[in-house]
Every structure is written in structure tokens, then in C-alpha cells.
Regions:
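Bacterial signal peptide processing site
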Residues: 17-19
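C-terminal motif of bacterial Sec signal peptides marking the signal peptidase cleavage site
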Residues: 12-15
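Conserved functional acidic sites
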Residues: 30-251
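Bacterial N-terminal signal peptides that target proteins for export
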Residues: 1-6
Length: 251
């Protein structure tokens, strides 16, 4: 009887005692910018420089293009982005501002240097961007974003309802051949934007590396595009990466 009473007392004390604490999700590691794991997946490491050639086998000197990931920048509304500067002979041709939400990659703004023109993807007054990729993207996927594209010129701006569609497919063997190496697999990204605001017709993405092929007119209006294949990847300012500006590196 005494044993039964003691057992009942212990049970009641455990039932009424403090509940075990649970640790809230701390969110992504932002020590390297926005989301360290996602940045590594997409190749958006701050100060990383991708240099490209017009050839799939021979490096160019100087490179045909440099894509330089810059430190986190805050746009209006407090939206934090990673700017990527596209440079030719050291001069900026275009800037893409990317953000990462829930591991997904979004293009928020594209600026066309020397023209005063840019396009920003918004929902109402909020800078929301258009989706490019997810952490586990594979072939045969489509990401559709219905949004407003705000096109700014030097003295004016206009907002247009826009459908932005990113479709993924397996990259071909020829698209995966670069002066740097021949990759075994990757995703071809095909953009359909209606109406178009200077979107890239094609890119090739290799997970945990980045964009190994870029085809872009680097202008708001459609123009000639030449596919450019990666010839070198370096971290500017590091002992191995050198101090030369992106697009000025030695092959």
C-alpha cells in the first residue's frame, strides 16, 4: 500500500513538473552573407570571381567576361541581396541582385550599367524577386512567378505585370564542356519572360559550383548573345585568387 502511494506521488510530480524545453529554429547561418549553405550551393560566395571564355576549350586573355560576387547590400525596404557584377575588361556591364529565401534563389533587380536602366521585380511596394532555383532543383522543373516588373530609366519608370518562367533541363555534353573542366552533370536554365526585360536566354548551372555557362545580351532590349563558358574560378584577395579585378585575371 505504501509502495503504491509512493508510485502515485512520483507520477503526479513528473506530470506537474516543468515541460522539456525545445530549441527554436535558429534559421540559416548568415555569417558569410545571407545563407551560407545556399550560397555554397549556388556558387554565390562573397568575392568569388568566375571568368569566362567564348571558347569551350581555350581560355581567353583577358577573359571575355567576369562575374564577381560582391558583399551583401541592402535595397529599399530592407531587402538584403548579393550583387553580382558582370565585367568586361574591368568595366561593369550589368549587375544582378540576388536574394535567398527558404534556400531558394531569387533575382530581385537587374541593372544595365551606363544606360540608367534597371528592372526590379515587385509585389505591390515589396521587392520580392523572381525565382531561379531551389536547393534541390532537378531537370524538368518550372518555377513561375507572376509579378510586376518596374523598369526604371534615367528620369522615369513604369511598372508592367509580368510572368517570369524558369524551366530546367539536363545540360548537354557540349554545354558542360568548358576551358576549366568538363562537368559530368548540370542543369540548363531556360527563361521565358512575358513581356521580356533583358532576361538571359540560357544558363547552365552546376550545383555547388555555380553558373558555368552564361548567354546574355547584357541589355534591357533583346540583342545578340554569345554563350560564354567558365575558364577560371578564384576568390579575389585570397593567396590563390590574386588581387586582379574580376575579368582581368590571367588564364
Amino acid at each position: 500500500m505504501r509502495l503504491a502511494a509512493l508510485s502515485l506521488f512520483v507520477f503526479s510530480m513528473s506530470a506537474c513538473g516543468p515541460k522539456p524545453t525545445t530549441t527554436a529554429d535558429a534559421g540559416p547561418d548568415t555569417s558569410c552573407g545571407l545563407d551560407c549553405a545556399a550560397q555554397a550551393r549556388y556558387g554565390l560566395i562573397v568575392e568569388r570571381c568566375f571568368e569566362y571564355s567564348e571558347s569551350t576549350s581555350t581560355p581567353q586573355d583577358p577573359p571575355a567576361l567576369g562575374a564577381w560576387v560582391r558583399p551583401v547590400f541592402t535595397l529599399e525596404g530592407g531587402v538584403k541581396v548579393l550583387p553580382v557584377e558582370y565585367r568586361v575588361n574591368g568595366q561593369i556591364k550589368m549587375i544582378d541582385s540576388f536574394t535567398i529565401r527558404d534556400g531558394n534563389l531569387y533575382l530581385v533587380r537587374r541593372e544595365f550599367s551606363g544606360t540608367g536602366q534597371s528592372v526590379t521585380y515587385k509585389t505591390g511596394m515589396d521587392l520580392t524577386g523572381v525565382q531561379w532555383l531551389a536547393m534541390e532543383s532537378g531537370p524538368g522543373e518550372t518555377y513561375t512567378t507572376n509579378t510586376d516588373a518596374f523598369v526604371a530609366n534615367t528620369s522615369s519608370g513604369v511598372s508592367t505585370p509580368t510572368t517570369y518562367r524558369m524551366t530546367t533541363a539536363d545540360a548537354s555534353a557540349s554545354e558542360l564542356k568548358t576551358p576549366l573542366t568538363t562537368y559530368t552533370s548540370g542543369l540548363k536554365l531556360l527563361v521565358g519572360e512575358t513581356p521580356d526585360h533583358g532576361s538571359d536566354p540560357r544558363r547552365v548551372f552546376v550545383p555547388d559550383v555555380g553558373f558555368v555557362l552564361i548567354a546574355s545580351s547584357f541589355s534591357l532590349l533583346p540583342g545578340t548573345t554569345v554563350p560564354l563558358s567558365v575558364q577560371k574560378i578564384r576568390d579575389i584577395g585570397s593567396p590563390d585568387g590574386g588581387s586582379e579585378g574580376c575579368s582581368l585575371g590571367v588564364p
